[in-house]
Amino acid sequence: VIQYLPYIFIAAVAAAVAFCLTPFLSWLGERQGLLDRPGVRSDRTVHLSPVPRLGGIAIFAGFAIAVAIWLGLESPVVRGTLVGGFLIMLLGLIDDLRPMSAKVKFLFQLAAALVLVLYGVKIEWLTNPLGGYIYLGNWGLPLTIFWVVAMVNVVNLIDGLDGLAAGVSS
């Protein structure tokens, strides 16, 4: 168990940051009228009363602070991950406040994925379920961009289901 303490600590930091920010962001969302009202924008919403729309900020803050503590900010890959993640969080926030077209969201997601790639984040290898690894070579860049955009949309699809996105993302 002792060898896992650093991992437990960093997970606890991320959870604590998100946990501490959530009440403030909920209060702010309610005070500013930044609420997701059932049936107004999406039929995927399952809650029966309005809920604040600022939860993504708490999730990202927990992630970013934990990553900065754990890995530091010296690595371009870490910085790229945080910048790209911030852009996606910002996209979600803007879309929550002023809905955007699918085309605009896609272009924003593509830009965030390109930022990751420019910072050196790239899928280079795939694990072969039959054993060994598969080197992707030049296919790594388009696969990385596709994967980032796909995962952003997967989380977006489950967002609004009362904490499901937060749980899956954590």
For the regions a protein language model found, what residue spans apply to each?
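"…together with the soluble PPM/PP2C metallo-phosphatase catalytic core" -> "…together
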Residues: 2-170
